[in-house]
C-alpha cells in the first residue's frame, strides 16, 4: 500500500480489462481499447 492517500488513489483507482489488460478510468463501463465489458479494479494487495 502507498504511504499517502493521494498516491494510493492515483495508483489503484484504475480499472483493468480482463481481456487485454488495458488501463481504464474508474468510471469506465467498457474497455477503451477492445470494448470488452469485463473490467476489474486494480488489486490493492500484493500477490504471493
From Swiss-Prot:
Alphabetical keyword list: Ribonucleoprotein, Ribosomal protein
Alphabetized InterPro entries for the sequence: Ribosomal_eL40_arc, Ribosomal_eL40_dom, Ribosomal_eL40_sf, Ribosomal_zn-bd, Zinc_ribbon_dom
* Superkingdom classification of source: Archaea
Name one cellular component (GO) term.
Answer: ribosome
Please cite one Gene Ontology biological process associated with this protein. Answer: translation
User: A GO molecular-function term, please?
Assistant: structural constituent of ribosome
Q: SUPFAM superfamilies this protein is in?
A: Zn-binding ribosomal proteins
Ribonucleoprotein: is it a keyword of this entry?
Answer: yes
Mind telling me which NCBIfam families this protein's record contains?
PRK04136.1
Q: Which family does it belong to?
A: Belongs to the eukaryotic ribosomal protein eL40 family.
Name of this protein = Large ribosomal subunit protein eL40
Amino acid at each position: 500500500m502507498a504511504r499517502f492517500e493521494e498516491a494510493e488513489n492515483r495508483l489503484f483507482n484504475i480499472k483493468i480489462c480482463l481481456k487485454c489488460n488495458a488501463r481504464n478510468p474508474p468510471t469506465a463501463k467498457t474497455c477503451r481499447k477492445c470494448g470488452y465489458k469485463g473490467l476489474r479494479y486494480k488489486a490493492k494487495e500484493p500477490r504471493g
